[in-house]
């Protein structure tokens, strides 16, 4: 019998695992090669057999494994009649001990990556202006304030592209994470542990479809705050899901075990129960390092285009 290498990556799926091996990826690639390419995007942290085994036998941490599914794809002229299935990351499988107790969707799995200090160096997209904020004139030079407010309040699917807008999605900013680092600190308050998570990121703006004037000193801090809020929302959403499932996939218990061994001996027997009410404070700081070659887009207002 051949022994499995402990460095091999593992995945879970919501259906039968055999379906993944029977997929026919495009360009004639082997399923295992296409699956490896999907995992290498690292949107969800990769886990090897060794890492899962260590989590299973360690105190204060539960394992998680990237979740992969199959999606249909459009048939092309280069591959007529080819099977229309391709691999896609759908999130992460959450374990409590050795039992799979739930799945985190992809959006929350991005927050999981931050909470285990493995933030993906990938492009994300946020809507501008942030929800609940107004659209000042300097924020959208191509849209008058009344038009921007009407766009924001319109029901989904009702927006129509305006002249010069083409097929692009309005009001979107896409940053690329260049560097990211997360620090964890614990302290004791009233005899109970509190975990503080400090996330720091340096971003590059790769697309500015909202037409923001990034040379304006008043605009860039608002954008950085919006990016930080987006990351924090994902982290808090993932934390809420993990608490509901009673699975400490972040290793907060192991952190307390290292920093406060005496307190850990009191909590270890019912750690999963205590984890659901563990106070966790999340702090996120984002700095935009580069804003791209076009800092002040040459965009006409829509009423000018109509004339």
Residue ranges and their predicted role:
Residues 1-307:
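A glycine-rich, acidic short-motif signal
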């Amino acid at each position: 019998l051949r022994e499995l290498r402990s460095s091999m990556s593992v995945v879970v799926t919501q259906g039968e695992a055999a379906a993944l091996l029977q997929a026919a990826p495009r360009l004639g690639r082997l399923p295992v090669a296409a699956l490896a390419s999907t995992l290498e995007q690292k949107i969800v942290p990769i886990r090897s057999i060794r890492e899962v085994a260590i989590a299973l036998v360690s105190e204060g941490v539960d394992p998680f494994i990237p979740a992969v599914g199959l999606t249909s794809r459009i048939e092309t002229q280069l591959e007529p009649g080819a099977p229309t299935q391709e691999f896609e990351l759908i999130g992460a499988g959450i374990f409590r001990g050795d039992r799979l107790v739930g799945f985190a969707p992809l959006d929350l799995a991005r927050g999981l990556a931050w909470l285990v200090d493995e933030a993906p160096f990938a492009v994300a997209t946020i809507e501008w202006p942030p929800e609940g904020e107004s659209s000042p004139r300097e924020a959208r030079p191509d849209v008058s304030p009344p038009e921007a407010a009407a766009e924001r309040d319109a029901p989904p699917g009702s927006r129509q592209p305006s002249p010069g807008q083409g097929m692009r999605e309005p009001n979107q900013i896409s940053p690329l994470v260049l560097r990211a680092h997360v620090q964890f600190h614990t302290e004791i308050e009233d005899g109970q542990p509190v975990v503080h998570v400090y996330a720091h990121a340096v971003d590059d703006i790769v697309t500015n479809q909202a037409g923001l004037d990034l040379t304006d000193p008043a605009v860039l801090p608002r954008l950085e705050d919006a990016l930080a809020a987006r990351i924090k929302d994902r982290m808090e959403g993932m934390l809420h899901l993990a608490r509901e499932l009673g699975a400490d996939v972040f290793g907060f218990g192991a952190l307390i075990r290292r920093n406060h061994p005496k307190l850990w001996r009191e909590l270890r027997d019912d750690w999963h129960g205590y984890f659901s009410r563990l106070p966790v404070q999340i702090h996120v700081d984002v700095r935009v390092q580069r804003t791209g070659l076009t800092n002040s887009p040459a965009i006409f207002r829509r009423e000018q285009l109509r004339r």
